[in-house]
């Protein structure tokens, strides 16, 4: 089965307070999204890359692809208002059965082992999420915003990406 990396780049970066989304800011001479795509471009088990992006930044992604010779980048799709709309656009772009690895464009530090582990886990499971133990204290509140419970950190994880699906 083919392994497709779906780079979710539709965010507007409002929380960052910049004029452009954070995936298009430069770090170490390249845009963050370039670093992220490079990881998947260079991974031997990734067959294809699709980027889901806000319509205003399609040309930017095309330029990035040409400049870096990203030959695995086959599709640039329009992102939706919410993350799930963008994810659905990627799902709908493939009629055949494929493994889809959804990854945030602003997480360029994903490594080969994590990608390998996700793909390998899809041999057993239909859905896989990368998760790390939480170090934060999480609180549960009621309608009055009063603390009603503090769950044990032993049972909690922070979900990360990629999130992979058959």
State what each model feature region is.
Residues 2-58:
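N-terminal glycine-rich phosphate-binding loop and ensuing alpha1 helix
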Residues 7, 33, 90, 103-104, ...:
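Residue-level signal for inorganic ion chemistry
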Residues 16, 60-62, 118:
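Hydrophobic packing residues within well-ordered alpha-helices of enzyme cores
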Residues 34-97:
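Conserved N-terminal catalytic core of the sugar/cofactor nucleotidyltransferase
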Residues 58, 84-87, 102, 115, ...:
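A general structural signal for well-ordered alpha-helical segments in protein cores
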Residues 97-107:
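Short beta-strand-to-loop acidic/aromatic patch adjacent to the donor-nucleotide binding site
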Residues 109-165:
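Conserved core of the sugar-phosphate nucleotidyltransferase
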């Amino acid at each position: 089965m083919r392994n497709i990396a779906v780079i979710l780049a539709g965010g507007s970066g409002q929380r960052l307070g910049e004029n452009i989304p954070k995936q298009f800011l430069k770090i170490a001479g390249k845009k963050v999204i370039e670093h992220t795509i490079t990881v998947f471009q260079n991974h031997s088990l990734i067959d294809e890359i699709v980027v889901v992006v806000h319509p205003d930044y399609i040309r930017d992604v095309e330029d990035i692809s040409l400049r870096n010779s990203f030959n695995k980048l086959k599709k640039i799709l329009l992102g939706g208002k919410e993350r799930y709309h963008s994810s659905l656009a990627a799902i709908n772009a493939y009629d055949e059965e494929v493994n889809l690895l959804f990854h945030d464009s602003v997480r360029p530090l994903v490594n080969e082992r994590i990608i390998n582990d996700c793909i390998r886990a899809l041999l057993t499971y239909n859905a896989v999420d990368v998760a790390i133990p939480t170090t934060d204290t999480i609180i549960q509140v009621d309608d009055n915003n009063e603390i009603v419970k503090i769950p044990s950190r032993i049972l909690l994880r922070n979900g990360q990406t990629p999130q992979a699906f058959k």
